[in-house]
């Protein structure tokens, strides 16, 4: 079972965090 990662907020910080998490395969972005 993969972890679910929720990015709170929008803008560069949220986008960067989501991209980093997705590229590192940390879990599903929800």
UniProtKB/Swiss-Prot annotation:
Catalytic activity: (S)-malate + NAD(+) = oxaloacetate + NADH + H(+)
Domain of life: Bacteria
Enzyme class: oxidoreductase
Biological process according to GO: tricarboxylic acid cycle
EC numbers for this chain: 1.1.1.37
Gene Ontology MF term list: L-malate dehydrogenase (NAD+) activity
Alphabetically ordered keywords of this record: NAD, Oxidoreductase, Tricarboxylic acid cycle
Binding site for NAD(+): 9-14
Function noted in UniProt: Catalyzes the reversible oxidation of malate to oxaloacetate.
Sequence similarity: Belongs to the LDH/MDH superfamily. MDH type 3 family.
Protein name as catalogued: Malate dehydrogenase
Encoding gene (name): mdh
